[in-house]
């Protein structure tokens, strides 16, 4: 497994229910832990490393699509664009507008990778993603952890 070309996947937060993830820290303007950038997003740190291109072995990676809710600016990330219904940048389906590919992650577990978990908090309609299961406290699908987040599953794998 070649890890060349990996870049940090940065997480920013606006409280417990609005998170933004990017490989481009210029979108928010800071990578200083705890500092506030554009949109009042606070830098949390990197949640892992992903590729900005399909990587040295494209057969092992998949695009991680980024969508924004047009009503509340919350973001949603998935490797399965059919969950929203479009993979056309700028197109909107329902409440979600496709912003592009956030990066490329492994579709299956590889050496030196860890799961990238997706959680959902229903009352706020918020998603949370992490490679550290201790942040929410559960890795059992359907089980609620901290802040009411329920594990939906593993999106893919990050280094």
Q: Which residues fall in each region the model found?
A:
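Extracellular glycan-binding segments that recognize GlcNAc-based cell-wall polysaccharides
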Residues: 1-159
């Amino acid at each position: 497994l070649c890890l060349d070309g990996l870049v940090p996947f940065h997480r920013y937060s606006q409280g417990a229910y609005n998170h933004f993830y990017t490989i481009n820290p210029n979108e928010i303007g800071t990578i200083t832990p705890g500092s506030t950038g554009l949109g009042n997003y606070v830098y949390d740190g990197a949640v892992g490393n992903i590729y900005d291109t399909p990587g040295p072995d494209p057969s092992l990676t998949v695009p991680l699509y980024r969508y924004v809710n047009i009503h509340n600016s919350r973001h949603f990330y998935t490797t399965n664009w059919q969950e929203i219904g479009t993979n056309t940048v700028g197109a909107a389906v329902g409440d979600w507008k496709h912003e592009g590919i956030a990066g490329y992650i492994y579709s299956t577990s590889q050496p030196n990778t860890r799961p990238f978990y997706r959680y959902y908090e229903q009352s706020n309609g918020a998603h949370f993603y992490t490679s550290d299961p201790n942040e929410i406290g559960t890795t059992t699908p359907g089980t609620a952890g901290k802040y009411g987040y329920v594990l939906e599953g593993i999106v893919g794998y990050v280094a």
